[in-house]
Amino acid sequence: MRSVTLLIVLFLSLTITAQEAGFEKGIVAFEAGNKAYLEEDYDVAIKAYQEVLAEGLHSKEVYLNLGNAYYKNGQTASSILYYEKGLLHFKKDVDLLTNLQFAENQRIDRIEPLPDSIIKRVYKFLLNLMDSEGWAVTSLIFALLFAVAKTIKPRLRKIAGPSLIVALIAFLTLLFIQKIERSENYAIVFEPAVTVLSDPKIDAPVAFELHEGTKVKPVESFEEFQKIEIANGQSGWIVTSSIRFIKE
């Protein structure tokens, strides 16, 4: 048993040491990226910021600076991709949203989006109230309040019922938000121009054309093809290698 305990302690020590080493390496890479960015050496800056992400360090500043470096380097699709990746973690960040909009203005395609569905409108409304973490914390707080009121503080029993209701509503809201987010994955077109086909085969009729930086929604895959939808409801098939997924 003693040897097992020592092994566990050693494993935990090595894990913590590795995490600290990764954090320090990420900080060094981030500072190197900032220096290269200020010197307008965008290739070096991009490589450094990618190293930060490879170390598992995800911050708004890393995604923002990486997107900016790609944009300054003339790589619009990559800049859009990393602003979008940043918004997966920091959904309401004004800087990421502003720079994304600026980069999107450089795209060739001008697509008029369809109105949001009822489910999408509800999803956005709930996220405007609180993000996923906020709903999770709310559910936990009111669940604890219910437990305290029910078992520890008899005088608070009158708030036990309302606390349980709020906890359940917050929890169900969290599940709804997570389900929507898990079911949706978008991608960015990375080719200067790509033909969207009516069927998943090379000689299929061309449905329409898209250009670098356009955001698409993959809905189905078949061999080397991906069926995609765009914001105006049009759909078709493209070669999977011509897009990069926002969630990887």
Predicted regions and their residues:
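Membrane-embedded alpha-helical segments of integral membrane proteins
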Residues: 109-152
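Boundary regions of SH3-family modules and the immediately adjacent low-complexity/disordered segments
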Residues: 76, 154-194, 198-208, 217-219, ...
